[in-house]
């Protein structure tokens, strides 16, 4: 992982790539959001990881998440990019997620639900229409939901993290990073990197005696008492962002690409 930190001569908050997506994970006391930039061949750049304190029962948390939809980040070539699409996990407080997504607009926001197993042929399915609640009133088929084979995207992320970065000599000769390469900024925290790779793929035996592959967390707690579950959220947020790049990759210029840096 250190090669990623060394190879990137740019800092958190600065864009590269063609467009941005984000993945949001909702928990009891916070909402975590990872913003990624995407280039050709699913090459990606971590732009920023944001922790919104307060959780889904705090309206200010949703307001802060909404504000991210209108925020822009400076591109290395001078323009400014906004989030084209944001995926938000519905595993916790789904009704609150649906209500927020309805208000924010499904054109930019997609509630997602992770499903078990590997489905490489169709890792993303939907959208399906589910009931939602708005101001205490049930809205039939009021929200759109995408189902995601998260294990497939996690495997893809780990495979991309193992790709070798081009050497200085390669770059001088005109070479670029291989398709799928994950660029991490030079000021990314070491703890964040550890949390991105906080799981491993293992073979487990089911109650019926069958074997299957399953992602399991590596780190239960660190010295500061950080639950292993929280460590997994960085990978979940990355997976959500990948989903949005797959589901609704902008055709032509990204939504905010034309905004000049004034």
Located regions from the model:
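Mg2+-dependent endonuclease catalytic cores in nucleic-acid-processing enzymes, primarily RNase H-like
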Residues: 12-13, 22, 42-208, 238, ...
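A contiguous, basic/glycine-rich beta-loop/short-helix subdomain that forms a polymer-engagement track
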Residues: 1-21
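Extracellular low-complexity, Gly/Ser/Thr-rich intrinsically disordered linkers
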Residues: 194-243
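Short conserved beta-strand segments at catalytic cores or DNA/RNA-binding microdomains
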Residues: 21-24, 34-41
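Short acidic, Gly/Ser-rich segments with clustered Asp/Glu that frequently serve as metal-coordination loops
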Residues: 26-30
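Extended hydrophobic-aromatic, low-complexity segments
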Residues: 31-34, 238-239
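Active-site proximal loops enriched in glycine and acidic residues that flank catalytic Cys/His/Asp
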Residues: 35-37, 90, 113, 217, ...
């Amino acid at each position: 992982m250190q090669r990623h930190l060394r190879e990137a001569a740019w800092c958190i908050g600065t864009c590269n790539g063609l467009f941005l997506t984000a993945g949001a994970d909702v928990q009891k006391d916070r909402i975590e959001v990872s913003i990624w930039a995407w280039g050709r061949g699913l090459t990606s750049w971590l732009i920023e990881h944001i922790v919104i304190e307060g959780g889904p029962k705090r309206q200010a948390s949703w307001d802060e998440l909404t504000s991210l939809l209108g925020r822009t980040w400076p591109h290395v070539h001078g323009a400014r990019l906004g989030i084209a699409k944001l995926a938000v996990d519905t595993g916790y407080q789904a009704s609150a997620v649906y209500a927020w997504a309805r208000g924010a607009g499904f054109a930019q926001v997609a509630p997602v639900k992770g499903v078990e197993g590997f489905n490489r042929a169709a890792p993303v399915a939907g959208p399906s229409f589910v009931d939602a609640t708005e101001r205490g009133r049930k809205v039939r088929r009021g929200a759109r939901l995408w189902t995601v084979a998260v294990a497939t995207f996690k495997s893809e992320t780990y495979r991309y993290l193992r790709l070798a970065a081009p050497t200085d000599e390669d770059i001088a000769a005109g070479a670029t990073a291989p398709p799928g390469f994950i660029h991490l900024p030079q000021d990314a925290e070491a703890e964040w990197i550890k949390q991105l790779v906080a799981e491993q793929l293992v073979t487990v035996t089911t109650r019926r005696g069958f074997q299957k592959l399953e992602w399991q967390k590596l780190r239960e707690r660190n010295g500061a008492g950080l639950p292993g579950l929280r460590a997994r959220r960085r990978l979940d947020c990355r997976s959500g962002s990948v989903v949005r790049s797959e589901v609704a990759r902008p055709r032509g210029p990204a939504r905010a690409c034309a905004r000049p840096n004034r």
